[in-house]
Amino acid sequence: MINEKFSKIGFVLAMAGSAVGLGNAWKFPTMVGNNGGSAFIILYLLLTFAIAFVAFLAELSIGKLGESDIVSSLYKLAPKNKKAWSLSGFFMIGAILIASFYMVVIGWILKYIYLSFSPLLSDTKAAGEQFNTLLSNDLSSAVLCFSLVFLMVFFAVSKGVKSGIEKLNIWMMPSLFVLLVCMLFYALSMGDGFVKAAKFLFVPNFSAITPDVVLQALGLAFFSLSMGVGVIPTYAANLPEKTNLIKSTLSIILINILIGIMMGLVVFTFIFAYGADSTASGPGLIFISLVTLFAKLGVVGNVMAVAFFISLLFAGITSAVSMIEPFAYYLVRKFEISRKMALLYIGAFVYILGIFCILSYYSDTSSAFSVCGKPFFDALDFLTSNIMMPIGAIVFSFFVGYKLKKESLYLLFGDFMGRAFFEIWYFFLRYVVPVAICAIMIYQMAGK
């Protein structure tokens, strides 16, 4: 079976689409603002290029050298114990688990796009009740919106690499950027609010950098790039020949950082312009705090709300698509079935899990859909973010650093980096990255 190849720009935008997600709006800006401003950004950049960049190239090499799905690539490349190594490829199941609850959240965004065409709630308590109602009492809306997002994501993946995933990202990623630029221009007109947002994000406070903040930055740098669940090797298997792997990786990382900073400027301009809580984070920042601020602008606020939630929709869908593709690609190649048939199997599994996630927040069924005292939604989030992704990332990095021939890696990357730089990269891959990932995993587990 011949791989369907991305174009060079298609690969960069598809990988950037996977990396740019909802966390760029509600996690990255808050972490920057509350942990030293530009001091945190400098730390984040250093860790991204010292750790995440190294691990990203390692996963890229599995797909590029294996030229197949993650399971088959590991089997092909492993010098011995091929079956055992190929089984580690099933960490890609983590991707479809993530997709199941991630699409529920994108469904909330879809609901808020609809709500943004009507007068918005300016009272924080009322806005909070509106959001809580969607989660715990409005089952029909939650299921309908999740179902619509589910259909959009699976339709895009069903069209394949070129006609589906690449075309989606070539359209959505520039559109996301244009929407953010338009919102930034409006934010500039808000004077003092924009100045305070810029200071909040960019004025360095190095005294805020503690070991705890370093680990937060390390976790953000690492897992914002979709590592550990087979997305990178799967996309890399469809790379065109003679692609500059270093340049492509740098482009993906920089796009991810740029979108996060732009989101932060937009979000915190509104926060500071109206004196809202700058320490708010997570879904509450987006679905409660920002909604009340948009409401204060009247019709202009409605327009801004629609643009903002559409930008989040684009970011969410491109990420969700990347989570479905690895397992679909595996089923198509392994069992020689059609892409649509593979997606039928995956879709049934993902849809059921998504419904379970919705029911775990619904007031009448929450107790029946809990795991170890957590809502099923939260349990899936914990399993994938704190266990599957870190372990998968360690396994893939160890495989490349200790099981692949060093010269094979140099032949792959040598045209794009000098020997000295390659040796530094290889050292970091073998000795620094595994320790860093273990530190992240221990920190995240301890925090839970």
Where are these regions (language model features)?
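Helix-loop-helix connectors at the membrane interface of multi-pass transporters/channels
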Residues: I2, S72, I106-N137, A236-K242, ...
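Inter-helical loop and helix-membrane interface segments of multi-pass membrane transporters/permeases
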Residues: N3, T30-N35, L65-F90, M103-K162, ...
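Select transmembrane alpha-helical segments in multipass membrane proteins
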Residues: F6-M15, F40-L43, K82-I96, V143-S147, ...
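Loop-to-transmembrane helix boundary motifs in multi-pass membrane proteins
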Residues: G10-V12, S18, V143-L144, I255-I261, ...
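C-terminal membrane-solvent junction of multi-pass transporters and transport-like membrane proteins
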Residues: L87, M92, F335-G347, A379-I437
